[in-house]
Structure formats: C-alpha cells, structure tokens
Amino acid sequence: MKNNEYKYGGVLMTKPYYNKNKMILVHSDTFKFLSKMKPESMDMIFADPPYFLSNGGISNSGGQVVSVDKGDWDKISSFEEKHEFNRKWIRLAKEVLKPNGTVWISGSLHNIYSVGMALEQEGFKILNNITWQKTNPAPNLSCRYFTHSTETILWARKNDKKARHYYNYDLMKELNDGKQMKDVWTGSLTKKVEKWAGKHPTQKPEYLLERIILASTKEGDYILDPFVGSGTTGVVAKRLGRRFIGIDAEKEYLKIARKRLEAENETN
C-alpha cells in the first residue's frame, strides 16, 4: 500500500478529505473513486445525482426570482450524454454494492426516467418508486403547467434471484401508526435550521434520509453517497450508528459536509 493510500473497511482509497469516527469524506471525481473501491463492500448506496437543470431557467426562492443554474456540474448538452452519465456511475456503483445491498436514487422529472432505465440496463431490479410529496414547494412562476411538488426516489437491488435485500418492515409499520408504510411520503423541504453550515442548491431534509437508512440498513452497515453534497446522508448515518463514505468533486460542498459531520461527532 502506498503512503497516500488508506484502507477503510477493506476499501482502498487515497487520503480522505475528512476521516473521523468511521465517517469519511473524499474529494474526488466519483467515477475515478468508485472504480478504485473494493468490489461488494457497501451495504447501501444513496445517491442524489445531478438533475441537469442548469439551462438558464428561473425559479423562486424566498419570494425572489432566482436562476436555476447551479454550476457546471449540473449542465449537460444532450439526452444521450445525460443517459451515458447515469449508466456509467450506476454501473460502477453496482460493482461496489454487496450482493444483498440496495441503492436509493433521488431525482426529478428532469433525470429520473433516465435513471430508472439505466438501473434496468445495468442489471438492477426496482423495488419501489417512492414519491416524495413536498408540503411547501416553490411556486410555479410561469403559470403554464402544474406546480412541481414531488420528487421520485427509486429503490433497487441487483437483479439476482439469490439476492435477499434487507427491509425493516416492522419498524416502518411502527413508525406509521401500525399501518403498512406506503410509497408516498409527505413532508416539508429542508428546514433552515439544517442549512446552518452553508448553502447547497439541492440539500435533502434529514427526515428523508432517516427513513431510508432505517428501512434498509442495520447498525454498523456501510453506506456510500457518491454525490455527497452538503453531507445529509453522512450526518444521519452517524446519528443512527452506521459507517459512511461520501464522495464529491466540489470542495465548497465538502466544506459544508465536514462542518456538519464535525458538529454531529461532537453531539453523538
């Protein structure tokens, strides 16, 4: 092993951006890092990949008209390029996922259909099509179509008859007043109190990741987020006693994620 390489749970990596209490952040191109990871080493993957919305449009934020351009990482020139991007990272993610592991992928109408197709093309079986119904979506400024108030989260496992994915049915039922948990989840956008460490354009609320992690992992499991952004997956993973690796190519977002993980380490 070279001087600048580390081992984490059997996963070979270069020196991490952050490494404390089994919480790892890596500054890297996702494709490059995934290709170096140990095969079948992760119990669960949560991904919120680029939505490819940055096309010069406008949206609403706090009553103000704002650009939807999020950065070069969210721009793409064609559907073919978008779909190849999704197929490539999903193919690499499959290699590092354990035989009984699962992957969750969040998206909007702008990319989720490509994601769903890519999952099936790369040998996954989709288990659920979760609809996240937002109680306080941004208003529709154009008034030319229905207000976008939902996002989709696909849950999938490898398309292998021998695969036995984990689902904590009893806990989900308990959290839903003794009734079976349905595939429509209702809740607010990310609260301001969760955005204290800095701004990220697509930060997910902690309650969403809490349900996902509790439903599909056990304490001590390895969770990977290949587009970690502001670090919500890692924060909730730490809180729930899971081990975590997060990857991002943008240092400005890793700084936010590190602040949040440091705060979580101090309190838990």
UniProtKB/Swiss-Prot annotation:
Q: Supply the SUPFAM superfamilies for this chain.
A: S-adenosyl-L-methionine-dependent methyltransferases
The organism's superkingdom is given as Bacteria
According to the UniProt entry, what is the EC number of this protein? 2.1.1.72
- Which InterPro entries does its entry note? DNA_methylase_N4/N6, DNA_methylase_N6_adenine_CS, RM_Methyltransferase, SAM-dependent_MTases_sf
Q: Name one GO molecular function term.
A: N-methyltransferase activity
Q: Known CDD domains for this protein?
A: AdoMet_MTases (cd02440)
| Reactions mediated catalytically | a 2'-deoxyadenosine in DNA + S-adenosyl-L-methionine = an N(6)-methyl-2'-deoxyadenosine in DNA + S-adenosyl-L-homocysteine + H(+)
Q: Which terms does the UniProt entry file under GO BP?
A: DNA restriction-modification system; methylation
Q: Does the keyword Heme apply?
A: no
Q: Which UniProt keywords apply?
A: DNA-binding, Methyltransferase, Restriction system, S-adenosyl-L-methionine, Transferase
Keyword Ribonucleoprotein tagged: no
The record's annotation in Pfam families points to: N6_N4_Mtase (PF01555)
Q: Name one GO cellular component term.
A: cytoplasm
Q: What does this protein do?
A: Further methylates DNA that is already methylated at 5'-GATC-3' sites. Essential for establishment of a previously unmethylated plasmid transformed into the cell as single-stranded DNA, enhances plasmid transfer to DpnII-containing strains of Streptococcus pneumoniae.
**Subunit structure of this chain's protein:** Homodimer.
Q: What is this protein called?
A: Type II methyltransferase M2.DpnII
Q: Which species expresses this protein natively? A: Streptococcus pneumoniae
Gene symbol?
dpnA
